UniProtKB/Swiss-Prot annotation:
Cleaved signal peptide residues: none
Cross-referenced PROSITE patterns: DAGK
Enzyme class (EC, first level): transferase
Compartment(s) where it occurs, according to its Swiss-Prot or TrEMBL record: Cytoplasm
Induction or repression: Part of the probable 18 gene mamAB operon.
Knockout-associated phenotype: No visible phenotype, magnetic response and magnetosome formation is wild-type. Deletion of genes mamH to mamV (amb0961 to amb0978) gives cells with no magnetosomes and no magnetic response.
NCBIfam families: MamU
Note, other: This bacteria makes up to 20 cubo-octahedral magnetosomes of about 45 nm in diameter which contain membrane-bound crystals of magnetite (Fe(3)O(4)). Expression of just the minimal mamAB gene cluster (amb0961 to amb0978), including this gene, is sufficient to form a minimal magnetosome chain with small magnetite particles.
Any one GO molecular-function label of the UniProt entry: ATP binding
Cited Pfam families: DAGK_cat
Protein name (record): Putative lipid kinase MamU
Gene3D superfamilies in the cross-refs: 2.60.200.40, Probable inorganic polyphosphate/atp-NAD kinase, domain 1 (3.40.50.10330)
Amino acid sequence: MRIAAIINERAGTVACLSPPVVAARLSAIWTSLGHQAHVTLAEGKDMGRAIRKACRDPAVHAVIIGGGDGSLSRSLKHVVGSGKSLGVLPLGTMNYVARQFGVPFDLDRAAVALADAVPTPTDLGRVNDRFFLIRACLGAFPEFIRSRDEARRKGGSFLDGALAGLTGLARGHRLIEAELIGPDVQARIATSFFMVSNNMCRDSDPFQLERERMDGATLGVYIGQGAGPFSLMDLGLQVAMGRWASNEALIRGSLPWLEIRTRQRKPLVSIDGEVEKMEAPFRFDILPGVLPMLVPK
């Protein structure tokens, strides 16, 4: 197998070990296992350019992204339809995708596992023209993420970031007032929390956000009940206990597609942990089996 690995050189693990050392280790492991590997260190827009180049190379069989969930998510627009398999080296903060597919968190073990992994058809979510592997959120959660990331960029710890996010929510946040349209569904909502996941979430550790499966061809839709600070606090406590499927503070359902018409023209949206403003209205779809994901045996 010919591997093109694109590594985010700003990822914490890479910075600690030294980027050239990481590249040399990965290349040596894959070569020793009989594969041809080209490892590229990049950051920012250069990562996108390197991924696009690898996806257009007819000799490449697999593209492996070393970074967090956001780096992986941004690669999807290049990988989907390219005929390449996609793998992940978990070098980010939460690493939800790596957890979901059983990729080891140790760098060397992850490289070995991916060398022998099986390309497995995997569903993708899509909101407008943006793919996602995990979830897309509107309401309080994107505002929490934005405040958290600002604190982290200023040198704060993970805990500092979380506290900054909670402080920001305590000062107030925008409600999502919207009309929902789906198969046999039409409703108006006013909520602090709105999430659409790639397949349904199961009750588990909240820091894993584990889905029941990744080939169920459905979107999971989760809407917080109520719109005030107390309802948001109740929801947060339930989620902190790992309750998604049994969370009484959530209305949940599964749909193949959903349209959302919000009063805000460009609300904040969190897509696989990355926050951006997106033009409303929103169209969510599930794309069954479009991504060949490298899944360890």
